[in-house]
Amino acid sequence: MSALHSLRTHAVSIRAVRKVYGDPESGPVALKRVDLDIRDNEFFTLLGPSGCGKTTLLRMIAGFEFPTEGEILLYGENIAARPPFERPVNTVFQHYALFPHMSIAENLAFGLESRPLGRSLGKAEIAERVREMLALVQMERFADRRPGQLSGGQQQRVALARALAPQPRVLLLDEPLSALDLKLRQAMREELKAIQAKTGITFIFVTHDQEEALTMSDRIAVLSEGQVQQVGPPEEIYERPGNRFVADFIGETNFIEAELLQRDGPLALYRGPGGEAFEAAARDGLAAGARVCLSIRPERLDLLAANTGGGLPCTVESQVYLGTDLQYRVRLADGSLLTVRTPNGTARRFATGEAACLAVAKDSASVLLD
């Protein structure tokens, strides 16, 4: 792919961006050196714990912060030094910042009447755009109400409609669901994804919630300590984490220190600390005897009766009822503790202190080198 074609298919490109507050040589570093390409029309999520730099990066795309070094390209054009009102992007904030003295329709119209970019709209065109946006978020019948008369979920829809009304090329969403209750948050995930698909606008979504990222995103960038740890589709991030941080941050996992025994094509055999054998993908550049860390998700393990052959002997240390699942902590013969999660009602239930056999699904381990 040519560089020109690549620029055209990327909505946002982050090039060697570094952000330091205060003195560039000695001040606190928010972003160390970030390179990212966000595709046109995709739902892209910046995911990470508090303080990882995800919100700082979003604010720099919006123009509320400026990079110490590097470029921010919007469809190939460097906008790193431009003020927010000169960027064809809009932001939906965690706190929706609706004007309390205006009706819902007036909130939407305000941004269209004062838009700094693009041609001015007439009153009839503004009214039609407001109707279209309220219909998009299913809020037409609330057009004359004030924000204080709406629920949190309804205010979130209005904030989204207001941000979409000027037809930005990129929409930035800064943890917009965090103030909603669980049921409403789950419903809004589906709505946001559907609206993004319908409008065709690139969405860049910031969250620390792994479930939000996994269920909504086309691709995810996982950040930690000002650096991008891994970029990929949700399934790749979860099933094939690039390093120990990603494996630990996304969902739950078991870490097992192991040694490479032998390689057989795309697979390899690894030995755990108690002599247990684990099969996992082979990694280039590793010779027999190399030390690695294996990551195995709890749902890839299964508990069987103690007299079942072929598994690893273990003892159930504890069990927790989670509704849809049962979660066990089991101890292997070498003393290591592993977490096992099984669907509730599909298998026998083990008691605390009971001997059992741990079965490991084939090719269920990920090999981590750091």
From Swiss-Prot:
It catalyses: ATP + H2O + polyamine-[polyamine-binding protein]Side 1 = ADP + phosphate + polyamineSide 2 + [polyamine-binding protein]Side 1. GO terms for cellular component: ATP-binding cassette (ABC) transporter complex. The keyword Cell inner membrane applies. Keywords: ATP-binding, Cell inner membrane, Cell membrane, Membrane, Nucleotide-binding, Translocase, Transport. Its EC number is 7.6.2.11. Residues 12-250 form the ABC transporter domain. Part of the ABC transporter complex PotABCD involved in spermidine/putrescine import. Responsible for energy coupling to the transport system. This is Spermidine/putrescine import ATP-binding protein PotA 1. It comes from Pseudomonas aeruginosa (strain ATCC 15692 / DSM 22644 / CIP 104116 / JCM 14847 / LMG 12228 / 1C / PRS 101 / PAO1). The lineage of its organism: Bacteria, Pseudomonadati, Pseudomonadota, Gammaproteobacteria, Pseudomonadales.
